[in-house]
Amino acid sequence: MKKSTMNKARSLTAIYSRHPINILLATLALFMTPSWDEAQAQTANPLNFSGDFRVRHERTTRQEPGARPDIRDPRNRDVVRFRFGINRKVNGLFNFGARLATGSPDDPNTTDITLGDFVNDLTISLDRAYLELAYKNLFLTGGKFANPFRTTELLWDGDVNLQGFGASYTFSGSKKIIPKLTGVYYIIDEQTTNPDSYMLGGQLQFSINVSSNLNLTLAGAYYDYTIKSLANAKSDDIQGNFLTPDGKAYLSDFDFIDAIATIDYRGFGERYPLRLVADFAKNRGALDEDEAYSGDLYIGKVAKKKDWRIQYGYALAENDGVLAAFSHDNTTLASNYEQHTLGIDYVVVENTILNLTFYRYRRHHLKSANSIDNEFFSRLRLNALVNF
């Protein structure tokens, strides 16, 4: 490291060492403010910024009937989410990126944070930090990075960022059918004295250009989890999945076959594209309660002012048909659920979206010993989102 950069780093560390989040900001500042002798070389590779802010009001009925204590009253809460990322090309091959986000550092499924707690300050952490290499059709990444697989929220919540190493290769040569192969080594839990937990996953995807108005995408994946310990898992990580009698390990292994089909049709005009997404997953590591599936229909888009989009979705997941630690957290049930989703998006002005999402859901199976009716829960969300 050059002397000027070292001096700058010492100064920033001295100023910001009083609080962990300030250290994160100082690290970003180190990349944002190059020394004079470096500035000219970096002009061709500027630092790129992106981010978004969302505010939400949420109402949930019948929170947890049958729990101890029995909670049947509705809950109203207000939630915010803030994300701010940077990325920069280091040279012709490598790209560095990082992102700050609100939310609990102990919960990989969400960047939301509930307002309240006697007006305490919001928690912000580094939810992405990665290095990428792109060479022709080959893509490599390492660190904590966005999920490179084609997914739905059945198995993967949209806020989950993988940590470890990933690679993909896009095969060229055909304009009609474009295959893509993706692989990931996903580090879940590293321990000094106990066995590590990790996932090895691969996906083969085919993008098929059927006609000028119709595209079809098919993706098949296999995710092989090895989870030896739940010592560092939180209660939200294991909700709904079967555990051993002592509660210290999963009862099942998690080895998923996941198949996704997406149809994009543009025959109704530019403003009203239609998308249909179907997902089916089977856990080969479970003896029973091992399947999950979902279907979503979208009409419209949210690209510019006065655009709108509507969505209807249906999903069903058995207890070990998903891994609750990384599947969706849109409702109070992460597995063993049946769910209907209705969503409406409207672009008020450029980069500003209003959204209404309604969930109606219940447990797929309910133990008779609980002596409770398996009635539907409801959750209504009103969102305002700004991108910048």
Labelled PLM ranges:
Residues 306-359:
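C-terminal hydrophobic structural anchor segments
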Residues 64-70, 111-114, 149-150, 188, ...:
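Extracytoplasmic loops and strand-loop junctions of Gram-negative outer membrane beta-barrel proteins
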Residues 108-112, 143, 151-156:
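Short, conserved acidic/polar surface loops in the N-terminal third of protein domains
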Residues 134-139, 148-310, 314-316, 358, ...:
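Signature for the C-terminal beta-barrel architecture of outer-membrane proteins
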Residues 38-140, 168-179, 208-214, 262, ...:
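Beta-barrel outer-membrane channel/assembly domains of diderm bacteria
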